[in-house]
């Protein structure tokens, strides 16, 4: 059975006294998380929840006032943060290059951290049926606080109603406050009867991600689709200009502006990625294999993107490529389709007609690939999508680790 995971963000409406209780809880939880984080940092990064619970549980109960389940959740929250950091360090090794020597790579571990992980935002993790539960026929939320349980109403927009039909399993939620409003973020899982099978693939779609075109796709029918990124980047430049102006002032009001702009930009970027991925999944439907480049470990340092302008380098580093792949994955799973990631080696350098691989054949200044062997010429992003799609066909044929190999001509 295939499983899909989504996060529902419930807008809750606590009363004035309840807001004080939630504020006290989330602030205490934040301070407690920073205490646990410092302990882990100072003691060689132990990440076993059972052992940490034996050492820190009583302190969290007595000195920070957390209830039993919240104390356990606090430890797990911090462990999860360090495991995420550990994965990030592993996927982005330190690199250096001495004169006339090949570039060297060193795997980074948690020992590379210079200071403990910081929890800067008041929030708390709520376990289903312990810290939060739906009561009164599912119309009211019962929430745990340091002062006892409270009952709050919540909004159920039309797009959320299907999540309450009994087919979704709710997990550990996160209570947060944003601009004076309160939200409970609940991850949900659901099993689907239909599951992707390589034996019933109808479409193989290669997707090249970038900035000039946020996504360029190429399918088994030879159809190419470009998702223009020019207007998107122009709007991001407007956000950046507002941020730069606010940062130059450095006042408290400027910091509030920065916070609002950041939230607005993040929501807008999420919507852009949502619309792109929804378009792709709707267009191709069930039984589609979407193929992406695995950008894990790809370095956006000055050396690798030196051909870009300063603005281009900033845009490349900050665009949410990872979020797009996440959204595409869960949307694909809903339609019994699949997303795979392939090695990006040579995808932008290979001629899809004769197989010639040559870096110089890609001309960034005119955004074209011109093969010096057979003369084939096309948009450089399209070339990338074509090669990515080819690797997808190898995967369908049984090659679980498809990659392009350098072909001498």
What are these regions (language model features)?
Residues 1-409:
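Nucleic-acid substrate recognition interfaces
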């Amino acid at each position: 059975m295939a499983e899909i995971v989504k996060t529902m963000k419930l807008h809750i409406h606590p009363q004035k006294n309840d807001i004080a209780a939630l504020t006290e809880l989330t602030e205490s939880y934040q301070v407690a998380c920073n205490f646990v984080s410092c302990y882990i940092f100072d003691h060689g990064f132990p990440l076993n929840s059972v052992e940490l619970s034996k050492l820190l549980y009583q302190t969290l109960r007595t000195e920070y006032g957390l209830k039993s389940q919240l104390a356990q959740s606090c430890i797990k929250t911090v462990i999860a943060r360090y495991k995420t950091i550990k994965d990030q360090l592993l996927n982005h090794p330190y690199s250096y290059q001495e004169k006339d020597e090949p570039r060297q790579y060193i795997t980074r571990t948690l020992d590379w951290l210079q200071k403990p992980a910081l929890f800067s935002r008041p929030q708390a993790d709520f376990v289903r049926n312990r810290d939060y539960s739906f009561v009164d026929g599912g119309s009211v939320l019962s929430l745990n606080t340091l002062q006892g349980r409270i009952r709050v109403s919540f909004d159920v927009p039309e797009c959320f109603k299907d999540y309450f039909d009994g087919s979704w399993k709710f997990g550990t939620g996160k209570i947060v406050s944003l601009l004076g409003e309160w939200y409970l973020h609940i991850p949900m899982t659901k099993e689907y009867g239909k599951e992707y099978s390589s034996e019933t693939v109808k479409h193989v779609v290669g997707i090249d991600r970038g900035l000039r075109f946020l996504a360029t796709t190429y399918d088994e029918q030879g159809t190419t689709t470009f998702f223009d990124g020019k207007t998107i980047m122009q709007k991001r430049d407007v956000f950046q200009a507002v941020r730069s102006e606010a940062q130059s002032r450095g006042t408290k009001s400027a910091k509030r502006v920065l916070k609002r702009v950041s939230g607005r930009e993040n929501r807008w970027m999420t919507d852009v990625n949502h619309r792109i991925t929804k378009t792709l999944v709707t267009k191709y439907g069930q039984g589609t294999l979407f193929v992406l480049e695995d950008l894990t470990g790809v370095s956006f340092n000055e050396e690798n993107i030196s051909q870009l302008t300063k603005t281009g380098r900033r845009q490349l580093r900050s665009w949410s490529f990872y979020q797009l792949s996440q959204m595409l994955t869960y949307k694909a799973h809903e339609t019994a389709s699949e997303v795979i990631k392939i090695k990006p080696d040579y995808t932008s350098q290979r001629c899809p007609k004769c197989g010639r691989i040559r870096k110089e054949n890609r001309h960034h200044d005119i955004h074209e690939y011109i093969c010096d062997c057979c003369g084939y010429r096309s948009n450089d992003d399209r070339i990338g999508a074509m090669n990515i799609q080819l690797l997808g066909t190898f995967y369908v044929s049984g090659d679980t680790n498809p990659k392009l190999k350098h072909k001498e001509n």
